[in-house]
Amino acid sequence: MQADGKSTTTAVVLAAGLGTRMKSAMPKVLHPVAGRPMIGHVMATLAEAGIDRAVAVIGEGMEAVADAAAPHATAVQIDRLGTAHAVLAAREFIAANPADDLIVLYGDTPLITAETVDAMLAARRTAPQPGVVVLGFEPDDPGPYGRLILGADGSLEEIVEARDATAEQLAVGLCNSGVMVIDGARALEWLDRIGNGNAKGEYYLTDVVAIARADGAAAAVVIGDPDEVLGVNSRIELAEAEAIAQDRLRARAMEGGATLTDPLTVYFSWDTALGRDVTVGPNVVFGPGVRVGDNVEIRAFCHLEGATVAEGAVIGPFARLRPGADLGEGVRIGNFVEIKAADLAPGVKVNHLSYVGDSIVGAGANIGAGTITCNYDGHFKSKTIIGEGAFIGSNTA
């Protein structure tokens, strides 16, 4: 506990899985959801929950995962011998960062929210202060999941894997997500006592419940939203996670004052920022790094990434804004226009069939149809500068 009386938390994020079902050369946790690697979502959730002491457990040769987890620490799991073994791969970090609570999350479960993390920590810190808190959920099909068996008092008695469960236990609909909070003072001791006397010869984190109870500590369950605990192990599940993330982002946009005329056809990046009274037409895609001011209209079939759009601009239809596009107030970008690495001052019009790249365009300039800025001579890329109020005629290069 800190000097100010606030409880402390250390987080371990398990990210060493090979993800063989993804059939990809890329580590599973680096596959993006809403434009951000899955592990990046988990790390951001921890930050939102106020947890800054975190370590990602990765496999050998996963330097790219370490980069994605930065600035947080990483620990390497040499042999993949189960979830408890993975947590203990971070023993040095855990011991060096003693805390009231140890929370274990998964790098391939990107949709968990800070509110759920907060609820789990609150349950751990509320009398009778259980030694372990497990995040449970109630899926439509509980078939393959471990079951959470509760006692008459509502406490967690055991976690039973589906393959080991009796018919009565299989009838239980409350399932184990794998996410848990453990008493930080006893976590390493309990984890060290987990054995591997099972068919796979692995060390299961779920066994910590029985060990804690054997020491007289209670175990509790917090029930979460099934969407939040969706683990991504295949491309199909990646698509499911993307759909859930997009629904959240669409709702956030509309709740923030934007109008989406056909929400299901609009795709956002995790960091898209829209002002108030923005209107977005159908089939619009936002890549990472887009900032849109108030009262902007983005018409159908536009693609934006790495762009800034100031108040009152009109984009599209069928327009593309690439990284470095910076549009001033009231700028108009019409159909089949592409803007890249260009500053367009207020009132500029580029209405038809044009490419403006690596350019500075002065206020009020009008760029005629078919205009191309040709900046590259085969060796060097130069800057095109168009003055205020200029009129560039059609089919100009």
Pin down the residues of each PLM region:
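Conserved N-terminal catalytic core of the sugar/cofactor nucleotidyltransferase
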Residues: 1-10, 32, 36-122
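Conserved alpha/beta core of the MobA/IspD/sugar-nucleotide pyrophosphorylase nucleotidyltransferase superfamily
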Residues: 3, 7, 173-274
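A phosphate-binding catalytic loop at a beta-strand-loop-alpha-helix junction
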Residues: 10-22
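Short beta-strand/turn micro-motifs composed of small residues
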Residues: 15, 58, 106, 136-137
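Conserved catalytic-core motifs of eukaryotic protein kinase domains, centered on the activation segment
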Residues: 22-26, 377
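Short glycine-enriched, charge-decorated loop/helix-capping segments at active-site entrances
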Residues: 26-32, 76, 194-197
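Conserved core of the sugar-phosphate nucleotidyltransferase
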Residues: 63, 70, 112-199, 206, ...
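Structural signal for interior beta-strand "rungs" in well-ordered beta-sheet cores
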Residues: 259-397
